[in-house]
């Protein structure tokens, strides 16, 4: 019998006997474990061989045998739990232990670095599963980061300085304002072993032609081997950066036939997905990666929803308590903001916008927040921390305003906290705030109407590219803000847009109302090198490394 199964049977026997040694019979024990008399004898003999108990059998009718426990079920359960934890079998650990507080304590004690059989393993604790990693779909902040570890694209953007770098394409040139040429590396392999072909690249880029930022791509052809020509309907100075974004990452052209591709995707990036469940995401360094192989061999993201309620929740990276810590922090490039929905009569009403933005000002929200949140929140007066576009002007409550609807996407604890503060403030002005939570996909598509939306945005480097790109690619914003998005996109592509002025106009009209900038924090270990937090609150796994243990 496998050791794990035997351990489970012993724990069950110990629990049924309440851990007490006793006189009993083989039939009684077999009934407790719902097995045959013969199988029960085999179990007892095997458990005795393991040193967990003694079984002194008595022969004869009416005779009772002696069962003595030498090992407690709790001790064996702890040992079993440690084994499961070491094997990263979190699903089974949760089932075995049951108690969430105990599971959390065990997980936290095993965070950070592990060195096993010559392999460096990094364990990270996160507050929610990362089940959808499909490029081109609606991806949240953390899924966007993970996708960048799994997939490659024609180009990539350096997370630290925002500079454009080569990826699958080693060089590129602009032939004319409407014609770009990219030269691709041969010998690139997917995680499932197949070599990347030009058809994969062409297929991947054509599949995103329906997205607003890629809709100007007229044709994609390969005139010679490992050469890719992209023809546009309008000039785009940002095209090389656009092709380094997550939607433009390269998939195997047969991806739709591969099982559970969204949660177990196959790319050509530095890490391959090994496991992705509701309790754990495990990715492993790809030995055949065409670039420098990652120095951390394996990254395990353990999921514990309970940490979502902690203000500094999100990403937890801590080693043993006695180890020195290194804290990496930055003020996010982006903010929480209110979005007024022009499709509703209250969302389109300028008086309502003026008054709501006045009573729900950033300083009011921070003032009414608990101290633990005040330490992490910074009042926002622009979409970026350096901008001061919002002006707080006293405004009178519109006559007849009795209720408002606020909507945000679920699985985000700070949304609930901020919404609760808003509800409290508005109630003091005799306005009822109806709060709705919807899925991230529903939020992204924006088909549902709401007077106001509570959103958040994290912009990546370079900001003059990503700010407009991020806002333009969210359908909800295009539904709520009635401006000529296509004309603005054309000006942006031509380099004719003053981005600061454009954002200031959105803030001045109260279409968007900045609320809070959030401090992003990673607490790691001093033995970890190369940890540089990016604007998404994570770090590039392939660039981090651990100094090896002393010989």
From Swiss-Prot:
Q: Does the keyword Repressor apply?
A: yes
Q: Tell me which residues form the DNA-binding region.
A: 26-49
Q: Which residues form the HTH marR-type domain?
A: 1-116
Alphabetically sorted, this entry's keywords are: Activator, DNA-binding, Repressor, Transcription, Transcription regulation
Return the annotated region ranges for Solute-binding.
163-492
Q: Which Pfam families does the protein's record reference? A: SBP_bac_5 (PF00496), SgrR_N (PF12793)
Spell out the InterPro entries in the cross-references.
Answer: SBP_5 (IPR039424), SBP_5_dom (IPR000914), SgrR_HTH_N (IPR025370), Tscrpt_reg_SgrR (IPR023767)
The domain of life for this entry's organism is Bacteria
GO terms for biological process, alphabetical: negative regulation of DNA-templated transcription; peptide transport; positive regulation of DNA-templated transcription
Question: What terms describe the molecular function in GO for this protein?
Answer: DNA binding; peptide transmembrane transporter activity
The protein's role, per its UniProt record:
Activates the small RNA gene sgrS under glucose-phosphate stress conditions as well as yfdZ. Represses its own transcription under both stress and non-stress conditions. Might act as a sensor of the intracellular accumulation of phosphoglucose by binding these molecules in its C-terminal solute-binding domain.
| Record-given protein name | HTH-type transcriptional regulator SgrR
What is the native source organism of this protein? Escherichia coli O6:K15:H31 (strain 536 / UPEC)
């Amino acid at each position: 019998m496998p050791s794990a199964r035997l351990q489970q049977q012993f724990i069950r026997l110990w629990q049924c006997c309440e851990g007490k040694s006793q006189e009993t019979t083989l039939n009684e024990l077999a009934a407790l474990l719902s097995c045959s008399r013969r199988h029960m004898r085999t179990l007892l003999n095997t458990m005795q061989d393991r040193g967990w108990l003694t079984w002194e059998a008595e022969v004869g009718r009416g005779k009772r045998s002696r069962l003595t426990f030498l090992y407690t079920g709790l001790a064996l359960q702890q040992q079993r739990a440690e084994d499961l934890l070491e094997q990263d079998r979190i699903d089974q650990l949760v089932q075995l232990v049951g108690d969430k507080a105990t599971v959390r304590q065990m997980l936290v004690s095993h965070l950070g670095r592990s060195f096993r059989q010559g392999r460096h393993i990094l364990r990270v604790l996160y507050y929610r599963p990362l089940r959808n990693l499909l490029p081109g779909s609606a991806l949240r902040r953390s899924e966007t980061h993970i996708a960048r570890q799994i997939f490659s694209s024609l180009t990539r953007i350096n997370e630290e300085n925002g500079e454009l770098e080569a990826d699958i394409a080693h060089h590129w040139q602009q032939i004319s304002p409407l014609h770009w040429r990219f030269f691709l590396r041969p010998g690139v392999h997917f995680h499932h072993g197949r070599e990347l072909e030009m058809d994969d690249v062409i297929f991947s880029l054509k599949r995103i032609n329906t997205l607003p930022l890629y809709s100007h791509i007229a044709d994609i052809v390969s005139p010679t081997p490992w050469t890719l020509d992209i023809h546009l309907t309008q000039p785009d100075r940002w095209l090389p950066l656009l092709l380094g974004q997550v939607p433009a990452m390269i998939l195997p052209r047969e991806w739709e036939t591969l099982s559970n591709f969204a949660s177990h995707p196959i790319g050509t990036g530095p890490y391959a997905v090994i496991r992705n469940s509701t309790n754990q995401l495990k990715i492993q360094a790809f030995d055949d990666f065409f670039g420098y192989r990652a120095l951390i061999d394996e990254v395990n993201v353990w999921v514990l929803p309970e940490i979502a309620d902690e203000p500094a929740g999100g990403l937890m990276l801590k080693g043993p308590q006695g180890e020195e810590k290194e804290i990496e922090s930055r003020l996010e490039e982006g903010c929480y903001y209110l979005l007024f929905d022009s499709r509703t009569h209250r969302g389109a009403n300028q008086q309502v916008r003026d008054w709501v933005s006045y009573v729900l000002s950033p300083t009011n929200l921070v003032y009414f927040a608990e101290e633990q949140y005040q330490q992490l929140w910074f009042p926002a007066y622009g979409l970026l921390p350096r901008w001061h576009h919002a002006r707080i002007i006293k405004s009178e409550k519109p006559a007849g305003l009795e209720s408002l609807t606020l909507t945000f996407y679920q699985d985000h604890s700070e949304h609930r906290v901020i919404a609760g503060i808003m509800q409290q403030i508005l109630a003091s002005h005799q306005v009822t705030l109806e709060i709705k939570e919807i899925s991230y996909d529903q939020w992204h598509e924006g088909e549902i109407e709401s007077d106001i939306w509570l959103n958040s945005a994290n912009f990546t480097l370079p900001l003059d590219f990503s700010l407009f790109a991020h806002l333009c690619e969210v359908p909800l914003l295009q539904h709520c803000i009635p401006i000529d998005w296509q004309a603005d996109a054309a000006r942006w592509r031509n380099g004719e847009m003053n981005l600061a002025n454009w954002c200031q106009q959105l803030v001045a009209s109260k279409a968007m109302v900045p609320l809070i900038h959030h401090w992003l924090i990673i607490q790691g270990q001093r033995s970890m090198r190369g940890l540089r937090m990016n604007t998404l609150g994570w770090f590039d796994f392939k660039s981090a490394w651990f100094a090896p243990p002393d010989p």
